[in-house]
Amino acid sequence: MPAASKNVVMIDNYDSFTWNLYEYLCQEGANVEVFRNDQITIPEIEQLKPDVVVISPGPGHPRTDSGISRDVISHFKGKIPVFGVCMGQQCIFEEFGGDVEYAGEIVHGKTSTVKHDNKGMFKNVPQDVAVTRYHSLAGTLKSLPDCLEITARTDNGIIMGVRHKKYTIEGVQFHPESILTEEGHLMIQNILNVSGGYWEENANGAAQRKESILEKIYAQRRKDYEFEMNRPGRRFADLELYLSMGLAPPLINFYDRLEQNISAGKVAILSEIKRASPSKGVIDGDANAAKQALNYAKAGVATISVLTEPTWFKGNIQDLEVARKAIDSVANRPCILRKEFIFNKYQILEARLAGADTVLLIVKMLS
């Protein structure tokens, strides 16, 4: 069932973050109903016919302050997906026999990086993702139930995520709905993409769903940049240093450049340089970006869009760099736009240093 048609019941453990979580779920297309943990019964939830149940964050201890939350987990296991956030995860931990105790530190609105298993909520989420924490309690490793597996941890070993090995039940200790959490929207999308009561059942359903080309490119570019961002001399800090040293070429305003053509009674043409596409295959595998850019500039175009994605479009960031150099001496040169599947600040910084005046952002890829 598509995320847009998922009916979600959220149990509110009297926490203000419940409504941030509500907003994220709604933004991803879910229909969400929220009920306080002492103001609804299991039969009433059954009557609502939810596709997913979410257990919210909350103050206190899951054993004493979570109301109906643990009963909800017990009742709906093996029937529909159940996801928990912060106290919601602690409820999962305790319901299956684990202990939630003092975590050894108190954190309130602080970020930590976590490593994860790239499954469930963490599918396609980069490693060392920064997440926001508000807690002093956590599930203990020594009491981890045999039926649960750890999905994420901080650098100092605190459990940040658990998943049931059989049932579609998963939780995280941090807050994906916090603005400081990286890839929070992707995590929420992943929640809503789960169906059925068992992971095995869900895996079969997921296998039947055809992955979109955008999803394929997105996943591949994440892998590409995990490598690229760790190359010596190409790390984020390196690019920031280059920018501070004034190594980025001067830029022109994209909108002003379009307006120049329009004000002069000309068509503001946005031209494009690409060697291939997913739909057309190879268009011109030998296309020279510098030569093509100069031809476009001489023809009076307002903007030159340069595809820099290597796998499906056969481009690269060097294409943009040489295209910019080729037109720098042209009077009233066109604007250079990087057309790419952009999902992080590194790619924007990289584009700027290569000579881009602006970049294309695909809203569906942003979180």
UniProtKB/Swiss-Prot annotation:
Active-site positions on this chain: 86, 175, 177
Keywords linked to the UniProt accession: Amino-acid biosynthesis, Aromatic amino acid biosynthesis, Glutamine amidotransferase, Lyase, Multifunctional enzyme, Tryptophan biosynthesis
Region (Indole-3-glycerol phosphate synthase): 209-367
GO molecular function: anthranilate synthase activity; indole-3-glycerol-phosphate synthase activity
Biological or metabolic pathway of the protein: Amino-acid biosynthesis; L-tryptophan biosynthesis; L-tryptophan from chorismate: step 1/5; Amino-acid biosynthesis; L-tryptophan biosynthesis; L-tryptophan from chorismate: step 4/5
Binding, L-glutamine: 58-60, 90, 136-137
Domain named Glutamine amidotransferase type-1: residues: 7-201
Presence of the UniProt keyword Transmembrane helix in the record: no
Cross-referenced SUPFAM superfamilies: Class I glutamine amidotransferase-like, Ribulose-phoshate binding barrel
Catalytic activity: chorismate + L-glutamine = anthranilate + pyruvate + L-glutamate + H(+); 1-(2-carboxyphenylamino)-1-deoxy-D-ribulose 5-phosphate + H(+) = (1S,2R)-1-C-(indol-3-yl)glycerol 3-phosphate + CO2 + H2O
Broad class of enzyme this protein falls into: lyase
EC number: 4.1.3.27, 4.1.1.48
GO cellular component, one term: cytosol
GO biological process: L-tryptophan biosynthetic process
Protein's UniProt keywords contain Nucleotide-binding: no
Note: Component I catalyzes the formation of anthranilate using ammonia rather than glutamine, whereas component II provides glutamine amidotransferase activity.
NCBIfam families: trpG_papA
Entry protein name: Multifunctional tryptophan biosynthesis protein
Source organism of the structure: Pichia angusta
